[in-house]
Amino acid sequence: MGFKHKDIIGLQDLTREEIQLLLDTADNMKEINSRDIKKVPTLRGKTVVNVFYEASTRTRTSFEIAAKRLSADTINISASTSSVTKGETLSDTARNILAMKPDIIVMRHAASGAHHYLAQRVSCSVINAGDGAHEHPSQGLLDMLTMRQKFGTIEGLTVAIVGDITHSRVARSDIFGLTKMGAHVRLAGPPTMMPPGIERLGNVTVCRDMREAIEGVDVVMMLRIQLERQGKTLLPTLREYARYYGLNPQNLKLAKPGAMVMHPGPINRGVELSSYVADSDQSAILTQVENGVAVRMAMLYHVSGGELATE
């Protein structure tokens, strides 16, 4: 099957088959990334504009590397150094970028739904690099690629996602993607960080506490505490959070032997998980980062609609 979408706004919009196609393509891209010369001419002559209204290291750098390995020209625009600081609206920014004739816009924005708004107003492709608490599709895809790499399939896995679910766009993309691919998701977090009705998003169980959530699971996904997105009333102290919802060698034993530990980064060591767990053989955190480049290459390739050139 081909990829029918001009844009990738969220995994909620994609079918199981389309997610499978993106993961399979990412596997092919991993082969390119393992070469001595990590570059193919697939997107030669194409221009990718990265527009980031929020701070990012891994995602922005990963998209830039992905575009360059496909031979695209890349332009990076940061909100702190752009006309946004002078009061320019998203709509005006879009018009000005579009006047430069880009082929793909990769954007991160603090407002949920900003990418739908943008995609309706530009003729080029739009890829969501994270919008508010809505979705982060490339993170969801790289998480699934990392799981499939270890277990061979996502079908039948039980995955615990622990932490600040309310403010996490990663959690939503993981839920949409994992449940479509046949996994069961358990959620745990402080009641003030658990949105009502979240279980309606798919094959999801909301657990009373962390120990219940991680017992017997294949994967433990820890989420970052997003202090920049919440008021003081949601989280009494980081020490208290770590006591009840932090992953350490003791409670990790509740999961299946050899269970995989994941985190979208950046990590608050000693809060979401201990340094011992983060640096252990069970941790797949650096593998997630590595797989991020391949996944983003696959996303850029499919929205461009081109044929894969591998020589």
Curated annotation (Swiss-Prot):
One of its GO terms (molecular function) is amino acid binding. The keyword Transferase applies. Its EC number is 2.1.3.2. L-aspartate binds at K86, R169, R224. Transmembrane segments: none annotated. GO terms for biological process: 'de novo' pyrimidine nucleobase biosynthetic process; 'de novo' UMP biosynthetic process; amino acid metabolic process. InterPro entries: Asp/Orn_carbamoyltranf_P-bd (IPR006132), Asp/Orn_carbamoylTrfase (IPR006130), Asp/Orn_carbamoylTrfase_sf (IPR036901), Asp_carbamoyltransf (IPR002082), Asp_carbamoyltransf_Asp/Orn-bd (IPR006131). Disulfide bonds: none annotated. Pfam families: OTCace, OTCace_N. It catalyses: carbamoyl phosphate + L-aspartate = N-carbamoyl-L-aspartate + phosphate + H(+). It comes from the Bacteria. Pathway: Pyrimidine metabolism; UMP biosynthesis via de novo pathway; (S)-dihydroorotate from bicarbonate: step 2/3. Keywords: Pyrimidine biosynthesis, Transferase. Carbamoyl phosphate binds at R58, T59, R108, H136, Q139, G265, P266. Belongs to the aspartate/ornithine carbamoyltransferase superfamily. ATCase family. Heterododecamer (2C3:3R2) of six catalytic PyrB chains organized as two trimers (C3), and six regulatory PyrI chains organized as three dimers (R2). Catalyzes the condensation of carbamoyl phosphate and aspartate to form carbamoyl aspartate and inorganic phosphate, the committed step in the de novo pyrimidine nucleotide biosynthesis pathway. This is Aspartate carbamoyltransferase catalytic subunit. It comes from Geobacter sulfurreducens (strain ATCC 51573 / DSM 12127 / PCA).
